[in-house]
Amino acid sequence: MKILLIGYGAMNQRVARLAEEQGHEITGIIVPDKNNNYPYPTFEHISDAEGADVAIDFSNPELLLPLLDEDFELPLVVATTGEKEKITEKLEELSQKMPVFFSANMSYGIHVLTKLLEVAVPLLEGYDIELIEAHHNKKVDAPSGTLVKLYDVIKELKDNVNPVYDRHEKNEKRQPDDIGISAIRGGTIVGEHDVLFAGVDETIELTHRAQSKDIFANGALKAAERLVTKPKGYYTFDNINN
């Protein structure tokens, strides 16, 4: 594949390295600071990257959202977290004319975790639920896009949910519909996500721990390889392999 990268931070640098190791070609990058000495051609617009087969985005909403308003038909893999509703709304529109893929976490293991939640939440009705995520000290957004994804899965399965982000502001006992959401930032933690079900005299945890950021880069590459074979449409890990 010939790949256009949107953003060239730590994640897309990994994508570039792994892509070239696997025989793919990086045709260029879209970055906000074009004066840096990048190893690839820089572009302002997606449509400028002639010859690209697919674009892979690991950037931020400030860079990505204006690009999604442009006129292009290049298959697009998006992994940006933050401003999820705005991004997915624009991707839904673009999917009417080209294939697009979105995931808040490019790890297939996280996708499996969401499927486990779909089984566990109905079976553990009445258990208190807490969501905890931990990342490195350079991650900006909190809670992580992945934790939001896990919360969204739970919200679809329960009649009423009340997210609680800051307990020190609540001077009352925990309510049955509360879902505690906690974010930890420190060191070089790649990414950890825990779903805690607390019942009477027992707890059950579902946990995913990323041991290398390569899992996200490889996940994006595998999604791109599938996406370029697909007709127009909106794809996620739920349907990309159909």
UniProtKB/Swiss-Prot annotation:
Chief place of localization: cytoplasm
GO biological process: diaminopimelate biosynthetic process; lysine biosynthetic process via diaminopimelate
UniProt KW keywords: Amino-acid biosynthesis, Cytoplasm, Diaminopimelate biosynthesis, Lysine biosynthesis, NAD, NADP, Oxidoreductase
Catalytic residues in the record: H135, K139
Catalyzed reactions per annotation: (S)-2,3,4,5-tetrahydrodipicolinate + NAD(+) + H2O = (2S,4S)-4-hydroxy-2,3,4,5-tetrahydrodipicolinate + NADH + H(+); (S)-2,3,4,5-tetrahydrodipicolinate + NADP(+) + H2O = (2S,4S)-4-hydroxy-2,3,4,5-tetrahydrodipicolinate + NADPH + H(+)
Residues annotated as binding NAD(+): A79, T80, T81, S103, A104, N105, M106
SUPFAM superfamilies with a match to the protein in the record: Glyceraldehyde-3-phosphate dehydrogenase-like, C-terminal domain, NAD(P)-binding Rossmann-fold domains
UniProt pathway annotation: Amino-acid biosynthesis; L-lysine biosynthesis via DAP pathway; (S)-tetrahydrodipicolinate from L-aspartate: step 4/4
GO CC aspect terms: cytosol
Molecular function as annotated in GO: 4-hydroxy-tetrahydrodipicolinate reductase; NAD binding; NADP binding; oxidoreductase activity, acting on CH or CH2 groups, NAD or NADP as acceptor
Keyword check for Disulfide bond: no
The family this protein is said to belong to: Belongs to the DapB family.
NCBIfam families: dapB (TIGR00036)
Its job: Catalyzes the conversion of 4-hydroxy-tetrahydrodipicolinate (HTPA) to tetrahydrodipicolinate.
Name recorded for this polypeptide: 4-hydroxy-tetrahydrodipicolinate reductase
Source lineage: Bacteria, Bacillati, Bacillota, Bacilli, Bacillales
Gene that produces this protein: dapB
